[in-house]
């Protein structure tokens, strides 16, 4: 859902789901440096689902390894709940097998969680309704 702030300014809502407060904080700072993007945060996959139900974001940045509900399990559930929501999976390693599993869960992009430029490029691609799969 795009938030209309005035006649000329649109905000894109990005939800970050990661169990690491340091990573969420860093991603938030990186995302909010981009004009017109605002962030929400979730602690794990289950929390992401709850936040998506409360306030529909325009895109989800989802960590793979989280307690309570991991990224792939969350992606499956989120695709049933909000099938049009673009999901960008962030993980330290991107072997071809993981990329294939992510695609099978309805994820539209995979990036290294430690490459800020790659994350921004992935978000931009998904917002243009393109896929963005990086591999190691």
Model-derived segments and spans:
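Non-catalytic signal-transmission and effector/linker regions of two-component phosphorelay proteins
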Residues: 1-13, 120-136
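Conserved sequence signature across two-component system core domains
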Residues: 17-18, 42, 60
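Two-component/phosphorelay signaling modules centered on CheY-like receiver
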Residues: 21-40
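Acidic catalytic/metal-coordinating carboxylates
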Residues: 44-47, 70-73
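Active-site beta3 strand of CheY-like receiver
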Residues: 55-61
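Receiver (REC) domain active-site loop signature in two-component systems and cognate sites
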Residues: 66
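Alpha4 helix (beta4-alpha4-beta5 surface) of REC/receiver domains from two-component response regulators
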Residues: 73, 94-111, 117-121
């Amino acid at each position: 859902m795009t938030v209309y702030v005035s006649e000329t300014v649109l905000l894109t809502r990005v939800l970050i789901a990661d169990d690491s407060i340091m990573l969420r904080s860093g991603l938030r700072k990186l995302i909010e440096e981009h004009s017109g993007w605002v962030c929400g945060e979730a602690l794990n996959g289950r929390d992401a689902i709850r936040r998506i139900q409360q306030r529909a974001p325009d895109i989800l940045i989802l960590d793979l390894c989280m307690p309570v509900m991991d990224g792939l399990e969350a992606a499956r559930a989120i695709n049933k709940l909000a099938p049009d929501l673009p999901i960008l999976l962030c993980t330290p390693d991107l072997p071809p097998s993981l990329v294939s599993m992510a695609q099978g869960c309805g994820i539209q992009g995979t990036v290294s969680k430690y490459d800020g430029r790659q994350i921004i490029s992935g978000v931009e691609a998904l917002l243009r309704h393109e896929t963005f799969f990086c591999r190691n």
